[in-house]
A protein has these predicted regions:
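Conserved Radical SAM active-site core
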Residues: 1-50
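Auxiliary Fe-S-binding modules of radical SAM enzymes
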Residues: 34-35, 41-129
Length: 129
């Protein structure tokens, strides 16, 4: 399960409870945070240490538009760092060295995009009709 959007550690207690259930079901937990790992470890807010302890993979650092990248999977800007907090994943896993992908689904006259397209990719699809 991935926690992102807003700041997950602002809701650390509630998300730790969810993460506990996810882990109990044998699934992994990935968290995207604008805080760095050092900043999170220094926090004393309720639930922060618990959520960190339940996190398999942390992507830390604020998104920086001037450092935008699509070359690293799941990472939006070059300043963001992947921290492998458990042995569930390893930095040697080839999935972590692939670029981002864009998935396009067309069904029933609707188009759904999932992913992070390279700049200009959507404009090459043409105007909406």
């Amino acid at each position: 399960m991935s926690f992102l959007g807003g700041e997950p550690f602002a809701q650390a207690e509630g998300l730790a409870a969810v993460a506990r259930g996810v882990r109990a079901a044998g699934r992994s937990v990935m968290v995207f945070s604008g805080y760095t790992l050092d900043e999170l470890r220094a926090q004393e807010a309720p639930g922060v240490a618990d959520l960190l302890a339940l996190t398999d993979l942390l992507v830390d650092g604020r998104y920086d538009e001037s450092r935008r990248t699509t070359q690293r999977r799941w990472v939006g800007s070059d300043n963001q760092v992947m921290h492998f907090l458990t042995d569930r994943y390893t930095p040697l896993d080839p999935r972590f060295h692939e670029g981002n992908h864009l998935e396009i689904r067309m069904r029933g006259g609707e188009i759904t995009l999932n992913g992070w397209p390279a700049l200009g990719r959507l404009t090459r699809l043409g105007p909406a009709r």
